């Protein structure tokens, strides 16, 4: 699991997020896609092949040497300990020695839904499997480069405790987490990579190799507009090589206009279709597991809304930020997305009108309710610019809309709707 996913799991101390399924304005790649990118920048990886049909596994295996590792390709961690819904087959990562074994393993995985600690209970459908040459690591280390607001730019993070849950290392032995902030203008300095290589236990020629790998990973990070390049394990092998065995690379969506080749690798089948649809209309949507649908303007207000719903005994079904200048069409599309979720039994709209005027939102709510044929309770709290006009529009709409005086009142009314 990534050291940097934890912030996506808790909001206000009460809501747990699923990092594999929730939109965080980053593009995620499959492991084989990340390896392809690393190969381009001179980063040492195992030789690998990817297959989408089990019948191709024997040929792919023949192009590789020695023992093979067969890995299901999904955007989720914990694959090795996962299981497949359809057959109960255990593990999305296996070792094998022959092409025939690889074919059997691919047949067990392809087209099946893999459930891990980072997926929903429905799992994620495996549509590709990577075969790679197995590496015998002498030491498994950890290395990452991430954008960190605390440092105002990229920072290298390393630990001699790799190949395991790095979050546990950070919690239990924080003294084994080493950081080196990078000046975004001057770039990475040799003394920084030398310092980290030494702290990771590299000496002599191996230290120079490790330093070069860190430099190559930084070039990948900076030239491809990555927000995170995480290598776990960053391994020293028994034959003296330094290999990046597993990688997680994220990219800022804002860089899509100049990283077209990378963004063409996006696998929307791995994403919540509601999130994909919301993105088309500039809506920031994250699906959760509750039954109170939320539509709010502003990320902070949206999180506060979810927290208060939870505190009042309800469970939010989503995070949905319509932004500061959403159109009536965007509001309508937001309603369509929310009402497509069969778990949603009540909608709560919480708008603080600044740039976005309350009368515009009110008109959008009325039109959206009519278009989708809304049949579930709707609670609306409006405040700010043109609030009185907005409330009047709602009152004259003839729709079954419950107005709330403030956020606390709105949360209570939404929760009470579910008790009727």
Swiss-Prot record:
Compartments reported by the entry: Mitochondrion
Entry binding sites for substrate: 297, 354-356
Enzyme class: ligase
The protein's Enzyme Commission number: 6.2.1.4
Highest taxon, organism lineage: Eukaryota
Record-level GO BP terms: succinyl-CoA metabolic process; tricarboxylic acid cycle
Keyword entries, A-Z: GTP-binding, Ligase, Magnesium, Metal-binding, Mitochondrion, Nucleotide-binding, Tricarboxylic acid cycle
One example GO MF annotation: ATP binding
Coiled-coil intervals: none
Residues in ATP-grasp domain copies: 35-263
Binding residues annotated for Mg(2+), in chain numbering: 232, 246
Cofactor(s) the protein needs: Mg(2+)
NCBIfam families the UniProt entry points to: PRK00696.1, sucCoAbeta
HAMAP family: Succ_CoA_beta, Succ_CoA_betaG_euk
Purpose of the protein: GTP-specific succinyl-CoA synthetase functions in the citric acid cycle (TCA), coupling the hydrolysis of succinyl-CoA to the synthesis of GTP and thus represents the only step of substrate-level phosphorylation in the TCA. The beta subunit provides nucleotide specificity of the enzyme and binds the substrate succinate, while the binding sites for coenzyme A and phosphate are found in the alpha subunit.
Protein name: Succinate--CoA ligase [GDP-forming] subunit beta, mitochondrial
Organism of provenance: Dictyostelium discoideum (Social amoeba)
UniProt gene name: scsB
């Amino acid at each position: 699991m990534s050291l940097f996913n934890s912030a996506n799991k808790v909001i206000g101390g009460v809501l747990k997020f699923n990092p594999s399924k929730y939109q965080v304005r980053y593009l995620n790649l499959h492991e084989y896609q990340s390896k392809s990118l690393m190969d381009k920048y001179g980063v040492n990886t195992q030789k690998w092949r990817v297959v989408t049909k089990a019948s191709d596994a024997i040929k792919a295996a023949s192009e590789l040497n020695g023992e093979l590792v067969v890995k299901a390709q999904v955007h989720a961690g914990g694959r090795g300990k996962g299981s497949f819904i359809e057959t109960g087959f255990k593990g999305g990562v296996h070792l094998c020695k022959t092409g025939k074994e690889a074919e059997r393993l691919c047949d067990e995985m392809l087209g099946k839904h893999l459930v891990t600690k980072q997926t929903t209970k429905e799992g994620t459908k495996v549509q590709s499997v990577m075969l790679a040459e197995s590496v015998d690591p002498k030491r498994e280390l950890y290395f990452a480069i991430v954008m960190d607001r605390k440092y105002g730019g990229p920072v290298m993070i390393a630990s001699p405790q790799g190949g395991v849950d790095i979050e546990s290392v950070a919690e239990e032995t924080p003294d084994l987490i080493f950081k080196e902030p990078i000046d975004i203008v001057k770039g990475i300095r040799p003394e920084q990579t030398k310092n980290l290589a030494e702290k990771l236990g590299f000496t002599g020629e191996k230290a120079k190799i490790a330093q070069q790998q860190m430099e190559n990973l930084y070039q990948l990070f900076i030239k491809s507009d990555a927000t995170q390049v995480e290598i776990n394990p960053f391994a020293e092998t028994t034959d003296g090589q330094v290999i990046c065995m597993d990688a997680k690379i994220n990219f800022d969506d804002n860089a899509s206009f100049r990283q077209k080749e990378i963004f063409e690798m996006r696998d929307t089948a791995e994403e919540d279709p509601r999130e994909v649809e919301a993105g088309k209309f500039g809506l920031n949507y994250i699906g959760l597991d509750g039954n109170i649908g939320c539509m709010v303007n502003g990320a902070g207000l949206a999180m506060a809304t979810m927290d208060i719903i939870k505190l009042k005994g309800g469970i939010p079904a989503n995070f949905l930020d319509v932004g500061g200048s959403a159109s009536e069409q965007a509001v309508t599309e937001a309603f369509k997305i929310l009402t497509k979720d069969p778990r949603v039994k009540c909608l709560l709209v919480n708008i603080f009108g600044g740039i976005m005027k309350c009368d515009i939102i009110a008109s959008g709510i009325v039109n959206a309710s009519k278009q989708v044929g809304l049949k579930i309770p709707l609670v609306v709290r409006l405040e700010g610019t043109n609030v009185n006009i907005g409330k009047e529009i709602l009152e004259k709409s003839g729709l079954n809309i419950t107005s709330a005086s403030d956020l606390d009142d709105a949360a209570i009314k939404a929760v009470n709707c579910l008790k009727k």
